[in-house]
Amino acid sequence: MGERSWPATPGEGWSAADRPPLLVSACLLGVACNHEARANTSEAVVALRRTRRLVPVCPEVAGGLPTPRPAAEIQPSGRVCTAAGDDVTDAYERGAAHAVRLARAVGATGAVLKARSPSCGCHEVYDGSFTRTRVPGEGVTARALRAAGVPVWSEEDVEAGTVDLQPGDEGR
């Protein structure tokens, strides 16, 4: 896939096709797909639509998990399990592979993912004890996207203004 040059600033009549694509956790855009069948809408992320083509993805649903579904956490072994002990790692890996394929297909210049999710967390995740204890780490999809060369950020990065996702600012 060839490199595309994006306009430095959005102009009048800038169509969605002219905006650099950004993969986004669907729950951040208002889709009720989290494990509780709720959205985690982030207005700061939704506002990126003014300068970006937002491409929604829910890796957990894409991996075959239902909505709602039992909460899951990454265990110290690296497996993803529910509190009842069901191993759902394969579904998480299928969802991550789908997200990587989607990012490549649309030429995504980055991804904004749900913080602390076992799929999408990109700075920290829960430790696997189901006590809401946070540890440094990445979710399955965040790790796969980063390994594929796609920069990843959380909605908290966008909300805090620690990343500027204007066209041309990828990787900052």
Language-model region placement:
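Internal, conserved structured core segments that host functional sites
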Residues: 112-130
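Active-site charged/polar residues at nucleotide-handling catalytic sites that mediate phosphoryl
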Residues: 106
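Short N-terminal binding/cap micro-motifs at the start of the first secondary-structure element
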Residues: 30-37
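Short, hydrophobic/glycine-enriched beta-strand segments
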Residues: 21-27, 56
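Short, well-ordered beta-to-alpha junction loops that form the rim of enzyme active sites
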Residues: 27, 114-117, 157
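Divalent-metal-activated hydrolytic enzyme cores
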Residues: 2-12, 17, 62, 70-74, ...
